[in-house]
Amino acid sequence: RTVGELIQNQIRVGLSRMERVVRERMTTQDVEAITPQTLINIRPVVAAIKEFFGTSQLSQFMDQNNPLSGLTHKRRLSALGPGGLSRERAGLEVRDVHSSH
């Protein structure tokens, strides 16, 4: 799966949590006092997105010990993770040095 699909799934999870909160508030609040501002809370959606970027295998903390380590970290590219290569399936053409180097 692509990164976009993974983020889309997380947003769906957040929206379903928000829907559950809205439905619960609609049953507990007075009909005359209900406004969109009192019903809708975006915290579940924000929490789902933060959870994805904080705990996903595709996210990394950037090495910022010094400017050179930050630069080399930005140059690294990993094709591992969900939907990518595994260490067992990576062939020689993937492990070989690219001709541009």
UniProtKB/Swiss-Prot annotation:
Reactions it catalyzes: RNA(n) + a ribonucleoside 5'-triphosphate = RNA(n+1) + diphosphate
GO cellular component: DNA-directed RNA polymerase complex
Molecular function per GO: DNA binding; DNA-directed RNA polymerase activity
Region Disordered: start-end pairs: 74-101
Keywords recorded for this protein, A-Z: DNA-directed RNA polymerase, Nucleotidyltransferase, Transcription, Transferase
Compositionally biased region (Basic and acidic residues): 86-101
One GO term (biological process): DNA-templated transcription
InterPro entries associated with the record: RNA_pol_Rpb2_3
Residue intervals passing through the bilayer: none
EC primary class: transferase
Enzyme Commission code(s) on record: 2.7.7.6
Pfam family, one: RNA_pol_Rpb2_3
Function: DNA-dependent RNA polymerase catalyzes the transcription of DNA into RNA using the four ribonucleoside triphosphates as substrates.
Family the entry assigns: Belongs to the RNA polymerase beta chain family.
Subunit structure: The RNAP catalytic core consists of 2 alpha, 1 beta, 1 beta' and 1 omega subunit. When a sigma factor is associated with the core the holoenzyme is formed, which can initiate transcription.
This protein's name: DNA-directed RNA polymerase subunit beta
Protein encoded by which gene: rpoB
